[in-house]
Regions:
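Residues lining hydrophobic/aromatic ligand-binding pockets adjacent to catalytic sites
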Residues: 1-215
Length: 215
């Protein structure tokens, strides 16, 4: 991931300590604690350098996903960020995960989130969902990543788009523009809006953008 990447020589100067939990979390996350559960995964399974390390020696490319599922129970599916996949292709991945407690967490297509106004993305959004629904029970939360240039000035546009999404699906939103994190009232307002829609927010732990590692 290039976002937040810094030169290795500068890493020693970075304070990697996690921030304290803000007091407003109690108002945004009220109610009883649920049963804890952890899903662990990477951003892709097609890593040739894992053959002979994570994957058995001589593992063929067509078997990478099958081997990946032996080690992890989820994946941040970046592939769907760069291309809208049809139900046939998604169905093949879903079949490999059959019988496993495994979740595919597709990232929304960047043609929706990174190009132009969100109001004009009805067709692309429907096509994106048409494909990922083929994951069936293996469909995990959908990650909606907004670019570093998408700031709070477009808040109303963003919230209107999020409210239009299916209420029976789980979404996590990632914002990157520094202004979301610079002003506590702006960030708190965002968290409250997401909580009202039963949506989560992504926490990004990266060296060059410690502000995104919120709690």
């Amino acid at each position: 991931m290039d976002f937040g990447r810094i030169e290795p020589k500068n890493l020693d100067a970075v304070l990697f300590r996690l921030p304290k939990e803000p007091a407003w979390n109690k108002t945004v996350l009220p109610g009883k604690k649920g049963k804890p559960g952890t899903y662990l995964g990477c951003a892709k399974w097609g890593r040739k350098e894992w053959v002979g390390k994570l994957y058995p020696p001589k593992t063929k490319k067509r078997d990478f996903l099958r081997q990946y599922i032996q080690h992890y129970n989820s994946i941040e599916l970046n592939a769907t960020h760069y291309k809208i996949y049809g139900a046939t292709g998604i169905g093949r991945w879903n079949k490999v995960a059959g019988g496993k407690d495994f979740k595919f967490c597709p990232k929304m297509y960047k043609g929706i989130t990174h190009r132009g106004n969100l109001k004009d993305k009805g067709f692309l959004t429907k096509e994106f969902f048409r494909g990922i629904l083929a994951f069936e029970d293996h469909l995990g939360p959908v990650f909606i990543q907004f670019s570093e240039s998408f700031g709070p000035k477009r808040k109303n546009e963003m919230l209107a788009f999020l409210k239009s999404l299916p209420a029976d699906m789980l979404f996590f939103v990632e914002v990157r523009h520094p202004e979301w994190f610079r002003n506590d009232s702006i960030f708190k307002e965002l968290l409250s809006a997401l909580a009202s829609m039963k949506m989560g927010i992504v926490i990004t732990d990266t060296a060059g953008r410690r502000d995104c590692c919120h709690m």
